[in-house]
């Protein structure tokens, strides 16, 4: 039981590493409409973060690199995205300061894709932790329009006195705007005991501006746990609810300065409660 309680937060680190302090999926600087987002510089108080994007010759994202600190925490994270000749994601390799601190060099996630339906069906990654081994398998569900509506995560744990077979441990649910162009609600349900029922643990509700999000990768954004990159527009407000610990609830309000292409050039995000302000500058080339 204690090992499971250790593993679940670690799975969360892998799935959502660095997202807490970074405004995923925004863009900026003076640019033309066809330029790519390559860098976001953000600053909150004395903390600063650099987020970089890299692309292949077909302008498909193949790497995301984060450097910086937040409240003394190293946010270093490097996500390499491997694609086949058709552009389908086959695997990712993630290295992060948080993983290194847990004794893990890297995490390789493999993706299964159905050519018959043109959809990603599942993904899996393994963790080798001293004393036991963990396998996380995710299964994706779609709506009639081909949008991912949920991913269910099954954990199998070896090395326990009684090995734990695959059990449903976490489900992320995705709700879209009426137009289908933005993710307006993302919620998480998790089991608190091995094999127990899922119950709500957190949720994020978004409203948007009417301007263009410069980096849009649609369903791939859900696969990569970078849901802000799904949206056609930029978030104007995010309400984050922590069901397990309501004292950690907060709201982010965003204001933007836009470039000639109608994309963000800079932004200010204000957190309530607390009043912390994150100033960001966005660059294309």
Where are these regions (language model features)?
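Buried hydrophobic residues that stabilize the cores of well-folded domains
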Residues: 19-285
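Positively charged n-region of N-terminal signal peptides that target proteins for export
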Residues: 1-4, 20
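C-terminal motif of bacterial Sec signal peptides marking the signal peptidase cleavage site
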Residues: 14-17
């Amino acid at each position: 039981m204690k090992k499971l309680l250790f593993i679940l937060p670690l799975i969360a680190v892998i799935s959502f590493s660095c997202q807490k302090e970074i405004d995923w999926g925004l863009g900026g600087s003076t640019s033309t409409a066809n330029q790519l987002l390559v860098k976001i510089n953000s600053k909150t108080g004395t903390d600063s973060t650099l987020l970089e994007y890299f692309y292949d010759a077909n302008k498909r994202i193949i790497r995301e690199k984060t450097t910086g600190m937040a409240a003394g925490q190293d946010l270093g994270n490097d996500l390499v995205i491997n694609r086949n000749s058709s552009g389908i994601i086959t695997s990712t390799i993630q290295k992060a300061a948080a993983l290194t601190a847990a004794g893990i060099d890297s995490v390789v996630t493999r993706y299964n894709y159905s050519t018959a339906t043109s959809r990603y069906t599942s993904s899996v990654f393994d963790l080798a932790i001293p004393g036991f081994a963990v396998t996380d398998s995710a299964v994706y569900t779609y709506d009639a329009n081909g949008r991912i509506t949920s991913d269910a995560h099954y954990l199998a744990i070896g090395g326990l006195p009684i090995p734990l077979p695959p059990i449903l441990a976490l489900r992320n649910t995705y709700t879209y705007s009426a137009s289908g162009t933005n993710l307006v609600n993302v919620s998480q349900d998790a089991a608190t005991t091995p094999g127990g029922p899922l119950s709500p643990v957190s949720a994020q509700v978004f409203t948007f501006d009417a301007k263009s999000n410069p980096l849009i990768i649609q369903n791939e954004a859900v696969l990569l746990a970078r849901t802000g990159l799904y949206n056609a527009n930029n978030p104007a407000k995010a309400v984050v609810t922590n069901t397990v610990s309501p004292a950690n609830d907060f709201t982010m309000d965003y204001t933007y300065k836009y470039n000639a292409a109608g994309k963000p050039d800079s932004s200010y995000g204000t957190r309530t409660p607390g009043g912390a302000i994150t100033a960001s500058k966005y660059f294309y080339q």
